[in-house]
Swiss-Prot record:
It comes from Saccharomyces cerevisiae (strain ATCC 204508 / S288c) (Baker's yeast). One of its GO terms (biological process) is cellular response to reactive oxygen species. Residues 71-138 are annotated as: Disordered. The lineage of its organism: Eukaryota, Fungi, Dikarya, Ascomycota, Saccharomycotina. The keyword Chaperone applies. Belongs to the SDHAF4 family. InterPro entries: SDHF4 (IPR012875). This is Succinate dehydrogenase assembly factor 4, mitochondrial. GO terms for molecular function: enzyme activator activity; protein folding chaperone. Residues 71-98 have a biased composition (Polar residues).
Length: 138
Protein backbone atom coordinates (compact mmCIF):
# COMPACT_ATOMS: atom_id res chain seq x y z
CA UNK A 1 0.00 0.00 0.00
CA UNK A 2 2.90 2.33 0.73
CA UNK A 3 4.15 1.79 -2.77
CA UNK A 4 0.71 2.69 -4.10
CA UNK A 5 0.73 6.01 -2.28
CA UNK A 6 4.21 6.84 -3.56
CA UNK A 7 3.30 5.89 -7.06
CA UNK A 8 0.21 8.12 -7.14
CA UNK A 9 2.27 11.12 -6.21
CA UNK A 10 0.11 12.01 -3.20
CA UNK A 11 1.91 14.36 -0.86
CA UNK A 12 0.88 15.14 2.70
CA UNK A 13 0.34 18.84 3.40
CA UNK A 14 3.31 20.33 5.18
CA UNK A 15 2.47 21.79 8.55
CA UNK A 16 4.52 24.23 10.56
CA UNK A 17 5.99 21.52 12.77
CA UNK A 18 7.08 19.41 9.80
CA UNK A 19 8.62 22.42 8.14
CA UNK A 20 10.61 23.11 11.29
CA UNK A 21 11.87 19.54 11.35
CA UNK A 22 12.93 19.78 7.72
CA UNK A 23 14.59 23.15 8.26
CA UNK A 24 12.16 25.15 6.19
CA UNK A 25 10.68 28.45 7.36
CA UNK A 26 6.98 28.70 8.05
CA UNK A 27 4.63 31.60 8.35
CA UNK A 28 3.28 32.19 11.82
CA UNK A 29 2.11 35.44 13.30
CA UNK A 30 4.46 36.58 16.04
CA UNK A 31 3.66 39.18 18.64
CA UNK A 32 6.07 41.84 19.58
CA UNK A 33 6.14 42.04 23.35
CA UNK A 34 7.06 45.44 24.68
CA UNK A 35 7.08 46.99 28.10
CA UNK A 36 6.71 50.54 26.90
CA UNK A 37 3.09 50.95 27.97
CA UNK A 38 1.93 49.25 31.13
CA UNK A 39 -1.62 49.83 32.35
CA UNK A 40 -1.75 51.65 35.64
CA UNK A 41 -1.96 55.05 37.24
CA UNK A 42 0.20 57.86 35.87
CA UNK A 43 3.67 58.21 37.35
CA UNK A 44 4.18 60.76 40.11
CA UNK A 45 6.87 63.39 39.92
CA UNK A 46 10.10 62.30 41.64
CA UNK A 47 9.62 64.43 44.78
CA UNK A 48 6.03 63.29 45.29
CA UNK A 49 7.01 59.63 44.72
CA UNK A 50 9.74 59.89 47.37
CA UNK A 51 7.30 61.50 49.81
CA UNK A 52 4.73 58.77 49.11
CA UNK A 53 7.28 56.02 49.79
CA UNK A 54 8.42 57.76 53.00
CA UNK A 55 4.82 58.01 54.24
CA UNK A 56 4.24 54.34 53.37
CA UNK A 57 7.27 53.31 55.45
CA UNK A 58 6.04 55.39 58.40
CA UNK A 59 2.50 54.01 58.13
CA UNK A 60 3.69 50.39 58.17
CA UNK A 61 6.12 50.87 61.05
CA UNK A 62 5.40 49.36 64.46
CA UNK A 63 5.35 52.82 66.06
CA UNK A 64 2.43 53.91 63.87
CA UNK A 65 0.55 50.70 64.65
CA UNK A 66 1.06 51.16 68.40
CA UNK A 67 -0.07 54.78 68.16
CA UNK A 68 -3.24 53.75 66.30
CA UNK A 69 -4.02 51.01 68.83
CA UNK A 70 -3.59 53.46 71.73
CA UNK A 71 -5.91 55.91 70.01
CA UNK A 72 -8.51 53.19 69.35
CA UNK A 73 -8.58 52.04 72.98
CA UNK A 74 -9.23 55.62 74.10
CA UNK A 75 -12.12 55.95 71.65
CA UNK A 76 -15.44 56.33 73.52
CA UNK A 77 -17.63 55.28 70.59
CA UNK A 78 -16.83 51.63 71.27
CA UNK A 79 -18.36 51.67 74.75
CA UNK A 80 -21.41 49.83 73.47
CA UNK A 81 -19.24 46.76 72.86
CA UNK A 82 -18.55 46.59 76.59
CA UNK A 83 -22.20 46.71 77.59
CA UNK A 84 -23.30 43.90 79.95
CA UNK A 85 -25.88 42.72 77.43
CA UNK A 86 -23.20 41.81 74.91
CA UNK A 87 -20.38 40.68 77.20
CA UNK A 88 -22.27 38.02 79.14
CA UNK A 89 -23.35 36.08 76.03
CA UNK A 90 -21.43 33.25 74.46
CA UNK A 91 -20.53 33.61 70.81
CA UNK A 92 -22.95 31.77 68.54
CA UNK A 93 -25.69 31.33 71.12
CA UNK A 94 -28.96 33.18 71.40
CA UNK A 95 -29.15 35.61 74.24
CA UNK A 96 -32.23 35.30 76.47
CA UNK A 97 -32.78 39.06 76.30
CA UNK A 98 -33.32 38.87 72.55
CA UNK A 99 -35.00 35.49 72.20
CA UNK A 100 -37.90 36.01 74.61
CA UNK A 101 -41.14 35.36 72.82
CA UNK A 102 -44.55 36.56 73.86
CA UNK A 103 -46.88 33.56 74.04
CA UNK A 104 -50.03 33.86 71.95
CA UNK A 105 -52.03 31.55 74.23
CA UNK A 106 -52.08 30.09 77.74
CA UNK A 107 -51.78 26.40 78.49
CA UNK A 108 -50.45 23.44 76.52
CA UNK A 109 -53.01 23.32 73.67
CA UNK A 110 -53.05 25.87 70.84
CA UNK A 111 -56.71 27.06 70.59
CA UNK A 112 -56.42 27.93 66.86
CA UNK A 113 -54.84 24.69 65.61
CA UNK A 114 -55.48 22.25 68.46
CA UNK A 115 -51.79 21.35 68.57
CA UNK A 116 -50.63 19.97 71.91
CA UNK A 117 -47.13 20.92 73.13
CA UNK A 118 -46.34 23.07 70.11
CA UNK A 119 -44.72 26.48 70.00
CA UNK A 120 -46.43 29.27 71.89
CA UNK A 121 -45.84 31.67 69.01
CA UNK A 122 -46.55 30.85 65.35
CA UNK A 123 -43.13 30.27 63.76
CA UNK A 124 -44.41 30.60 60.18
CA UNK A 125 -45.91 34.03 60.56
CA UNK A 126 -43.09 35.69 58.60
CA UNK A 127 -42.49 32.86 56.13
CA UNK A 128 -39.77 31.03 58.04
CA UNK A 129 -39.05 29.79 61.54
CA UNK A 130 -38.09 33.11 63.07
CA UNK A 131 -38.57 34.43 66.57
CA UNK A 132 -37.97 38.14 67.15
CA UNK A 133 -36.22 38.36 63.79
CA UNK A 134 -33.86 35.41 64.43
CA UNK A 135 -34.20 32.51 62.01
CA UNK A 136 -33.97 29.08 63.62
CA UNK A 137 -34.52 26.65 60.70
CA UNK A 138 -31.14 26.40 59.03
Amino acid sequence: MLCAIKSTGYRYPRTGALNLLRGRPFNMATRKITTERIPGPPKLPREEQEEFERLQRIATSQEAIDQYNAQATGDRTKESLNSPLLTKNDIGSFSPEFSKTIPEFEGDVNPKTGEVGGPKQDPLRHGDYSFNGRVTDF
